[in-house]
Amino acid sequence: MLDILEIRKYLPHRYPFLMIDRVVELIEGESITAYKNVSINEEIFQGHFPHFPVFPGVLLIEAMAQACGVLGFKTANKTPEDGSIYLFAGIDGVRFKRQVVPGDRVYFECKVVSAKRGIWKFDCVAKVDGELVTSATIMCADRVVG
C-alpha cells in the first residue's frame, strides 16, 4: 500500500534509522501492517553480534513506533513537512519471544487503542513467518515542532 518513497513522506527518519520498508495494509484510525527486511548488510551486525547476528530488540520496538507514526500521520492527514512529529512517549508490557536474524522479514501489526489530547496508544506485535517475536503497548505524542 505504501512503498519506501511514500513512507518517507510520513516519517522524518532516514538512513540508517528508517526501520519500515513497506506498509501492506493501513486502515486510518484503526490499524497498520508494515514490514522490515532484515539483511546481514545492516551496520548493526558488525557489533551485535559478529559471530551470532541478532537484530536488537530495541530496534524492533523502534520499528513498531515508526509504524505507529505512519498510522498517526495518515489518520490525522499530517506530515513532518507540516511541522508535525510523533514522539515516542512510552512503552508497556514488552515481551520478546524469539530472535530476529538476517534473512527474516518482520511484520509489524499495530492497532489504535486510544487517541486523546495528542497522545496515541497502540497495541503492537511483531511476527516472523507468522510466529510472535515481540509484543508491546506503545504510546506516541503528536506534537508541532519549529
Curated annotation (Swiss-Prot):
Keyword Lipid metabolism among record annotations: yes
Out of the domains of life, which is the source?
A: Bacteria
Protein EC: 4.2.1.59
**Catalytic residues?**
H48
Q: Which InterPro entries match?
A: FabA_FabZ, FabZ, HotDog_dom_sf
Q: State the Gene Ontology terms under molecular function.
A: (3R)-hydroxyacyl-[acyl-carrier-protein] dehydratase activity
Q: Might you report a single GO cellular component term?
A: membrane
Just give the chief location class: cytoplasm
Keyword terms: Cytoplasm, Lipid A biosynthesis, Lipid biosynthesis, Lipid metabolism, Lyase
Reaction equation(s) it catalyzes: a (3R)-hydroxyacyl-[ACP] = a (2E)-enoyl-[ACP] + H2O
What are its GO biological-process terms?
fatty acid biosynthetic process; lipid A biosynthetic process
Q: Where does the record place it?
A: Cytoplasm
Spell out where the chain crosses the membrane.
Answer: none
- What is this protein for, i.e. what is its function? Involved in unsaturated fatty acids biosynthesis. Catalyzes the dehydration of short chain beta-hydroxyacyl-ACPs and long chain saturated and unsaturated beta-hydroxyacyl-ACPs.
Q: Which family does it belong to?
A: Belongs to the thioester dehydratase family. FabZ subfamily.
- Sorted alphabetically, which HAMAP family does this protein's record hold? FabZ
Q: What is this protein called?
A: 3-hydroxyacyl-[acyl-carrier-protein] dehydratase FabZ
| Organism field | Teredinibacter turnerae (strain ATCC 39867 / T7901)
Its gene name is fabZ
